[in-house]
Amino acid sequence: MENKRFFIVYYSSKSNNTHRFMLKLNCKCLRLPIEQKDEPDEILESKIPTVNHPFILLTPTYAGGLGKLKGAVPKPVKKFLNNPVNRNNCKAVIASGNTNFNDTYCIAGDIISQKLQIPFLYKFELLGTNSDVENVIKIGNEFWEKNNF
């Protein structure tokens, strides 16, 4: 299955797990900048793009289980969504996570979905499987077409 429709904005840390998943999707996308250790907020904010058209956000989850939510949504994703234009153009979210963290598995998707009142389309573990890739393409295309973006 091929993605010919939707656009994804994604964040991937230096581990590149999310980036490797994105390469399998072979779709139009934009990667958010990686936060550098001890980087002042002003520097990170200056690197954050503005996206002037609809997109689906794909984000990893950084939470350690046991209900610990602090830092679940990566800082560059928060900064990106603090921009009203980006927030308005974010139409859905997909999240990755680690099932070892039980109750906080992919919680970044839940947090963003609730805060922005947008659909949480899909969740997958770490690098994702071939089935995850096919599912994201199918679900993303259906969502995009249904909403006429």
UniProtKB/Swiss-Prot annotation:
<comment type="function">
    <text>Probably involved in ribonucleotide reductase function.</text>
</comment>
<dbReference type="GO" id="GO:0010181">
    <property type="term" value="F:FMN binding"/>
</dbReference>
<dbReference type="InterPro" id="IPR020852">
    <property type="entry name" value="RNR_Ib_NrdI_bac"/>
</dbReference>
<dbReference type="InterPro" id="IPR029039">
    <property type="entry name" value="Flavoprotein-like_sf"/>
</dbReference>
<dbReference type="GO" id="GO:0036211">
    <property type="term" value="P:protein modification process"/>
</dbReference>
<dbReference type="InterPro" id="IPR004465">
    <property type="entry name" value="RNR_NrdI"/>
</dbReference>
<comment type="similarity">
    <text>Belongs to the NrdI family.</text>
</comment>
<dbReference type="Pfam" id="PF07972">
    <property type="entry name" value="Flavodoxin_NdrI"/>
</dbReference>
<protein>
    <recommendedName>
        <fullName>Protein NrdI</fullName>
    </recommendedName>
</protein>
